[in-house]
């Protein structure tokens, strides 16, 4: 049972949401009075309550989604709220659907989408993972953060070949190392207001760190938004190479670190938008002709379930006609299908851009 103080805060938060008529978040849409009453006294084994789930969305009424999972059990215990939000965000992933088993597929199917190097500036594929036996950010203790970091850094120090590299803890990081990582666009900052409000940044920078290989094409973030963000990237459009590197890294890490997995939802993450495959495959791409015809760009993107963002990711503008374009779908399909859909869409965009020239 949640304590009286928590329930009082929840009642207050619910009133605030109800009064916010211009709030468009999925939290507001699906936290009905019935659902609220059903969930407000519940508590996970690790002590998380509905307040942990909704407080970011209550504090930031301009949230798109507005909920986070404080631990793995929250997805089950608070499913009357999470399930409809997941179905809405991951279009058509119904509450009776089951996410397929992990399948990276035939990695030879992925190619260089821009062999002439005229359009794609860089390519990146990432996935998120949570370590089994640990809650997500809001419920972690400082000791757990440190324990996780030591497990992760020792696992990564065993990587060989192209993946071999160095782990840099954020704690005690020198200004020089910090600046170098910023210049390489590798350093993550303390969370934005949405993550801050979700209590995702406690004990900062304890247990946080960055690993990268010597070629700077493989990167792992430890305890940023998720326990692990595993990232493969390089300049140019060779999606095949980027994907193959990610797959071999994930398989290597998985041998040593058990990941949180849910029968129905796939791999578990802090934010419900990343569930399932957790895979985001993206390119930075120059499309000057399509940039001038945004409607056409969005139409093609929509056909292949692509998300079009500004150059520096969410909530930014396209600088010099350069877009960040990625797969939108992460649930109800395999890793292979998610990245293949993105590859097909990018090839189509390049084809149309060429025809318009």
From Swiss-Prot:
Reaction(s) the record says it catalyses: L-arginine + ATP = N(omega)-phospho-L-arginine + ADP + H(+)
Binding-site residues, L-arginine: 64-68, 225, 271, 314
Residue stretches making up the Phosphagen kinase C-terminal domain: 119-356
Classification via SUPFAM superfamilies: Glutamine synthetase/guanido kinase, Guanido kinase N-terminal domain
Main EC class the enzyme belongs to: transferase
InterPro entries membership: ATP-guanido_PTrfase (IPR000749), ATP-guanido_PTrfase_AS (IPR022415), ATP-guanido_PTrfase_cat (IPR022414), ATP-guanido_PTrfase_N (IPR022413), ATP-guanido_PTrfase_N_sf (IPR036802), Gln_synth/guanido_kin_cat_dom (IPR014746)
One Pfam family this sequence matches: ATP-gua_Ptrans
Gene3D superfamilies documented for this protein: ATP:guanido phosphotransferase, N-terminal domain, Glutamine synthetase/guanido kinase, catalytic domain
Modified residues (N-acetylalanine): 2
Domain annotation Phosphagen kinase N-terminal: ranges: 9-91
Keyword Oxidoreductase: no
GO MF, one annotated term: ATP binding
EC number assigned by the record: 2.7.3.3
GO biological processes: phosphocreatine biosynthetic process
Keywords for the protein's UniProt record, in alphabetical order: Acetylation, ATP-binding, Kinase, Nucleotide-binding, Transferase
GO cellular component, one term: extracellular space
Residues annotated for ATP binding in this entry: 122-126, 185, 229, 280-284, 309-314
Family designation: Belongs to the ATP:guanido phosphotransferase family.
Protein name: Arginine kinase
Organism: Eriocheir sinensis
């Amino acid at each position: 049972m949640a304590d009286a103080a928590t329930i009082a805060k929840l009642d207050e938060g619910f009133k605030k949401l109800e009064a916010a008529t211009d709030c468009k978040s999925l939290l507001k849409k699906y936290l009905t009075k019935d659902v609220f009453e059903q969930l407000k006294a519940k508590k996970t084994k690790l002590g998380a309550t509905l307040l942990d789930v909704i407080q970011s969305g209550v504090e930031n009424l301009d949230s798109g989604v507005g909920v986070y999972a404080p631990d793995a059990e929250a997805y089950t215990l608070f499913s009357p709220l999470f399930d409809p939000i997941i179905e809405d965000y991951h279009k058509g992933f119904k509450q009776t659907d089951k996410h397929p088993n992990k399948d990276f597929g035939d990695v030879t199917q992925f190619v260089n989408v821009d062999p002439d190097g005229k359009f794609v500036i860089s390519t990146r594929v990432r996935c998120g993972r949570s370590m089994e036996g640990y809650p997500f950010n809001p419920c972690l203790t400082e000791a757990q953060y440190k324990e996780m970091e030591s497990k992760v850094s020792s696992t990564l120090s065993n990587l060989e070949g192209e993946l071999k590299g160095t782990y840099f803890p954020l704690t005690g990081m020198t200004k020089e190392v910090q600046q170098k990582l910023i210049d390489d666009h590798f350093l993550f900052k303390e969370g934005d207001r949405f993550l801050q409000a979700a209590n995702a940044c406690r004990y900062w920078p304890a247990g946080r760190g960055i690993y990268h290989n010597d070629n700077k094409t493989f990167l792992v973030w430890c305890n940023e938004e998720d326990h692990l963000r595993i990232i493969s990237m390089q300049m140019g459009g060779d999606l095949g190479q980027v994907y193959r590197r990610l797959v071999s890294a994930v398989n290597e890490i998985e041998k040593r670190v058990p990941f949180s997995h849910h029968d129905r939802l796939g791999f578990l993450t802090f934010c419900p938008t990343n569930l399932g495959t957790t895979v985001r495959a993206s390119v930075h791409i120059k499309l000057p002709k399509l940039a001038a015809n945004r409607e056409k760009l969005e139409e093609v993107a929509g056909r292949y379930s692509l998300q079009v963002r500004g150059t520096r990711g969410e909530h930014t503008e396209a600088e010099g006609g350069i877009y960040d374009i990625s797969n939108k779908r992460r649930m109800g399909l395999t890793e292979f299908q998610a990245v293949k859909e993105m590859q097909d869409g990018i090839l189509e965009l390049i084809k149309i851009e060429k025809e318009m020239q």
